Amino acid sequence: MEKDQIQPRVLESVDTNSLSLLSSNTSSNMNSNTNNKLSIIASDISTGSVLSRPLTPPVVQDIENNSMLQWQFEKKEFIFDSNSTPSKQAKPLQRNSPYQGNSQSENQNQQLLNVRKRRSQLIGAKPKIPSKLYQSVSKLDLIDDKSFTSLPIAPPCNIETNEDDSGNNEYNNNKKRPRLNPVNELRVHNNKRNRYVSYGPSLDTKNYELTENTSQDIPPLVLVEDYIPYTQSKSTKKMVSISDLKSKLSKRRDNHIPLRVKNSYSEINKETNRNSFEPNSLTLIPHILRNTEENRDESNNPLDFIKEEIEISDISIPNSIENMVVNLVNIPSSNKSYDDLYLSELNVHSQLRKCVICEKALYEISSRLLNSGYYKEIVCEQCTVRYEEAAKIFENCEFESSMDESNLSSGTFSDLENSAEPFHLSTDVPKKINRHIEDNKIDLKKEISKKKDSFSKELIERLQLQLLENDKSIKHHFNKDAMGSKSMNWFLEARRKLKWKWRINGLLPHFLRNQNSDRLNFQP
């Protein structure tokens, strides 16, 4: 009966996991039973009770014919080989049998390792040991993006790009050279938006390739000066350089130096220039030195109040700058030995560079800077200190405009005095003056002629013509009131001209620009 009951249980579908649990439990129970029985037999033999108690057959004899439980007693394990579930991790087998040798255990461990490697390859798993590249930190992570550093910096805004509008960026990026047929007239255009065929004259493919190359060849290196915006002053004047100053002086016939002090510089330093008697060597700011004779005659001069106003508004260069410019222009005779006699006899424009100040021929630099006209001012070693001093002083100066030169060339003060009869300085000055006062008056006229906003000769002539036309219409009403209206008309016209001139120089206030926009639309 027992055999009949055991056979159907063996044929049932048994789960491998439950089977391993059952086998472990049954084997442990049977081992415990056999051990208990053997211990009882040993105790009986020692005590002499073997004869009194009958011996029971061992469990091995009962299970000899049972193949199902025989593998459990021999501590063999049922291995279920299947590749259907490679993701399950099988526990390593524990071989505790003392009958197995070391070589057999090593082979089994190697087989287990091979199984694990094969399984990891099938799954696509990564190795347990991470690579060194994964653990390393990039050097770009060390850049501080919160503060301004040297890298990375965007290109400056003033770099010109050949791209069209921002809406056509996709079209520009995918733009290709047009495909031309042998007749070079039909062109097929294909882009993301549409596809069309155009009929027209042939394109020059060489020029098209050149434009593509130039648009892509952006300079990789940018200077630091490109990031600094050039804050140009309101007056659109060119910066003073020694080469430009020498070229202008060579074209002029007179000894006049076409320089003047900037407005901002004259307003800031007008009080310091009055009270200072020594130049500042640190900032190299020129100061006007007063003569002792002028200080003595200040009390006797009746035109002191006019002179003070002129000194405040006058922006002509002081004597110290004028002397410095004269020293730069007047080269000593010893420097003539630097000139090349062979090149001087030829009527060919040579590419030999010379020093800006001493005009010494620089052969080595001219050989290196061949066919490059970007450098206008080159200084030798002996003239570096003089050049730096001149450049520091010229920062506060600017070139005179053509309007200022015309004002200086024409006798503006005399023409203004003749055109406007009621406006002259002789009414304010006493009639009885000595020769010293007359000399001061002449000097005063010369200083006024150098003023910035003085009237030009053309403007005064036009005003005189307008006044003559008005006089013809009101000849019969010529009286004192007419004389007053005549001077008033001249004053209004002069004020209008001044406003127009101020608007050109950028001196008109903002609140007057919109109000007087219609009035100031005047063409000289």
Swiss-Prot record:
Any one cellular-component term (Gene Ontology): cytoplasm
Stretches with biased composition (Polar residues): 83-101
Protein name per UniProt: Uncharacterized protein YBR138C
Region of interest (Disordered), ranges: 83-108, 155-179
Further information: Present with 195 molecules/cell in log phase SD medium.
Organism: Saccharomyces cerevisiae (strain ATCC 204508 / S288c)
Subcellular location: Cytoplasm
UniProt keyword annotations, A-Z: Cytoplasm
Superkingdom in the source lineage: Eukaryota
